[in-house]
Amino acid sequence: NAFNYTDADWAALEARRYDTTEHPDRPWVVIGDDGKYHYYGNFDWYHSIYNTNRFHQEHNLSLSGGGKDVNYYVSGRYYQQDGVLGGNMIRNKENYKNYSFRAKFDAQLFKWAKWSTNASLNAVNQKYPGPLNEAQTIAALEENVAPMFVPYNPDGSIVMYPADLRNVALGKGRTAALADPTNKHTIENLSLTLSNSLQLKLHKDLTFDASYNINNYRRLYKDRTAANIYSDAVGVTKTTTHYQKDTYRERPYEYTYHNVDAYFTYEHSWNKEHNFKAVAGMNYEKYRLVDNIVEQFGLGSDQIDSFNSVNDDTYWLVQQ
């Protein structure tokens, strides 16, 4: 038996089996003679953790036009969606936002010169609560999350190791991490693509083409986790680092790709029977990738998400 309930406790639980919300005459958390919290709830963990009605919105705008020598097309998009981890017990609710922009211009500068450009920008911001690994969090929530327990005590402290459960953390400590708003994670993505091309008609048989393309992608992970602070008795708080520690981590990832093409094309026909074509040019490509992880252990404040928040035990781990 994983529980420490007596026959009287089981009777108290049975009396509350139809209470979908806490009844004043049948409280879900009772303070025992030993000062410890004892739990007799009928708590709906599923809807308190998960957002079963996820709001999302999308807005699009585009403009196009032009004339004899110039044409353009511009478009923009905004998309937002609430995430799965967004129940009423979670303060830092999961959220996803996406902003995108694109523009294309074509211009006949002269009879012998044509220019075009194409630019796109895409930005993503995603945030989620709890431990670092969201998939493992969802898997762990299948264990030891019984309805008799609640996420918070009457004084607002977090429930993690209830006295009525034999030395086992609720949801392998994940419910406590989700209930603590200092556990938060963000993923920021920014992608920029720019293409320019120029064509010159130097002679009726000779053309010159040049293009420059750049593709830049940036991704930044920001992860803030805190040691679990919980209470199992009135006026008593405890701290454990069994599942996670006070850490702040950033992982910047970036790659940049440059491409330059330039070439001449000569094409000539004789008597509509003989054709000659020659192409000569050059290509230049440059690629750079940066992927680092900087992790700080020991934070001086639970309100500041920065490497500047330190204490006497702070140390860093850098991976490249």
Regions found by a protein language model. Name each.
Residues 45-48:
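Surface-exposed cleft-lining segments at the edges of enzyme active sites
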Residues 55-57, 99:
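Residues that act as N-cap/strand-start positions at coil-to-secondary-structure junctions
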Residues 65-67, 107-108, 198-204, 266-268:
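Residue-level signature of outer-membrane beta-barrel architecture
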Residues 50-53:
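Short Gly/Pro-enriched turn/cap motifs at secondary-structure boundaries
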Residues 58, 65, 195-200, 214-216:
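Alpha-helical support elements that line or immediately flank enzyme active sites
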Residues 1-42, 79-191, 209-211, 215-320:
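Surface-exposed loop/interface segments of Gram-negative outer-membrane beta-barrel transport/assembly proteins
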